[in-house]
Amino acid sequence: MEGDSAGGSAKKGRDKEYQAILPLRGKVLNTWEVDQNLLFGNKEIHDISVSIGVDPHKIGEKPDISNLRYGKICIMADADVDGSHIEVLLLTLFYKHFSYLMETGHIYISMPPLFKVSVPNKGKKKERRIYCLNEEELKKTVEKLKKEKFTDAQIVISRFKGLGEMDWEELKETSLDPETRRLLPVKVGLPGDDLTGKAMQILMGNKEADGVNSGLSATVISSNPIFN
């Protein structure tokens, strides 16, 4: 996950029996054009590989993943442009160098909310916290609450600037608890279909993702049906 501060809250909110947190500092390396033999020269990538228990491999290979330590590998980043860029860089790493984990359905993107809506007790209903992924969800939530006769003064809206702003209970509820979190499974095209590879080459080749097109790269990949 992105950030040391958020990592501390996540470690407190996780289920220690089966969940582990690996905080990453800043943006990881764009590995699209990095030789596989040089990957472990990067500390973050080395730590990722060791943590999940799988060695890097080439697209199309079917390595032994019997030592895979976790059934779900979830990418957690802030719900902003920088966070989307980090997601793209990690997706690039997993697609190019750990592709079998994508093929077998082990890679997910965590979808933290942008907004929290709080309302007080009303009748038999206790006070509530409602999390909204985006402005569209926020609008629908506010409209629904007004139909329940909540006033503008009773509807308190907070915006999260990042994962680090959430306390451990909020992070647990929105991103860690299997009953309440939202995850987007990452899937790739059918074997032999090189459409995904061509798209990745356009977006990540020649260090494009490190320049002004990073926001575009994040948007295109997150909306590409190959990855959804």
Predicted regions and their residues:
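Conserved phosphate-chemistry cores used by DNA topoisomerases
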Residues: 1-228
